Amino acid sequence: MKINYTLILISCLTLAACNSGQKRMEQGDYDTAVYQAVKRLQQKPQNEKAEKVLRQAYTLAVNEHTNVIVYQDKTNNPFKYDVMVSEYEKIAMLNNAIRRYPMYKDLVELTDVTDELIMVRDGAASAHRKEGVRLLNSGNKQRAREAFIQFIKANEYVARTVTEEELDNAQNAGTVNVIIQFANSRNFFRDYNSDAVFGAVRNNFKGTRYRFMRVVEPGELSFPADEIVQIEMEDAHIGGVDFTKNS
């Protein structure tokens, strides 16, 4: 059997390039190249090819993320800080990955973005809070729901940017208060005290609160009804006995 040593050599070189992150770097996927280079160095410390890739790919990755940040900062997009947070977080993730290789300090100087992350997170939180207030002031239930989501996002960036009271106000403003009414469609039910059945079901719903829906009682003053939902039942199960069929 004739062995193709050339093919084996090419395969080995290709595998080495992939393991070191060289191929990813050549494709412009600098972040992945960094991660692959770090992984290779953890497996084989001081691997020259991986060290070279790490130095080059990290610089290229940071430059790429920084360019996006600079561009976004010049725009009038009120939510530009969302993108900037994402880009700074990607740099921070690269830094954390590189720190897992003990000898990284001899290879790269990490770009600390701690202060920048704090600043852009504040900007993102402020932008979402401002948008939430604008939506809430429209006096529209749908807008109030959107305001609630904006407030949630604000607090995801910086905790307590929006108070619990403000969140409750937005949620209440966007909530539909619903009365549930039951109607029996068969005379059969009237023979088996259907009021008791419906009453039990209604009590299970009473006071139920979903994110933007609340079940209320007729005439309840605290939460005036917005809609009435009428449920027509055709069967019931009482005490484990099936009364579906009238026979």
Where in the sequence are the language-model features?
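Positively charged n-region of N-terminal signal peptides that target proteins for export
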Residues: 1-5
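Sec-dependent N-terminal signal peptides
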Residues: 6-10
